[in-house]
Amino acid sequence: MEYQYPMNEDWTTEEAVDVIAFFQQVENAYEKGADRDRLLNAYRRFKEIVPGKAEEKKICSQFEADSTYSPYRTVKQAKQSDQAIIKM
């Protein structure tokens, strides 16, 4: 699939890399399965960068519209599951 990750020009390079890492974990969950701990750690870091609910919803909705992968549903499943691998 060809799409761009949602970005904020105020993020540092490190923050942008960490946000992309979170979205890549979401992609992994849909495409081949993602390690639950890595996914949740990437989400925690994402929330440090994007602490507000409104901005999180905007960025995740943009990613979902472009990729068809839902960060919200992926994180929800990871939080509710005790499985080591999250597969959407």
Curated annotation (Swiss-Prot):
SUPFAM superfamilies: BH2638-like (SSF158504). It comes from the Bacteria. Belongs to the UPF0223 family. HAMAP family: UPF0223. NCBIfam families: PRK04387.1. This is UPF0223 protein RBAM_014500. The lineage of its organism: Bacteria, Bacillati, Bacillota, Bacilli, Bacillales.
